[in-house]
Amino acid sequence: MDLNFDLYMNGVVEQARNEIENAGYEQLTTADEVDKVLQQNGTSLVMVNSVCGCAGGIARPAASHALHYDKLPDRLVTVFAGQDKEATQQARDYFEGYAPSSPSFALIKDGKITEMIERHQIEGHDVMDVINQLQGLFDKYCDER
């Protein structure tokens, strides 16, 4: 049996993109798109997506379920580490004081990083832990919807 690795990975990436987009996150694929969103006033939750197991098993489900809450960011966006490299690097430029990490979440307010949930706060935790961390950020920085 001959398995085409690129074809397989394209399917994995497409599924990961669709999963987060179906949860209501806008995919940013260029540096210009990142700047256009993150320079706006208000709050933006950035999910740095990836194909690793903790992204699919923990981060993306948490990103979706955390939205069933009274307080929410103004915008939900995602960049894909290892896929949309320009957009991911541009987003990471906003994450001042934090090392590159994927999967991860960053809450940006008025163009500045407030806090970040890094991979080490996701990997090895259960989905509910990450939901609670996200909703804690929403409580602290976001308005009721």
From Swiss-Prot:
Organism: Staphylococcus haemolyticus (strain JCSC1435)
Source taxon at top rank: Bacteria
Sequence similarity: Belongs to the bacilliredoxin family.
Gene Ontology BP annotations: cell redox homeostasis
UniProt protein name: Bacilliredoxin SH1401
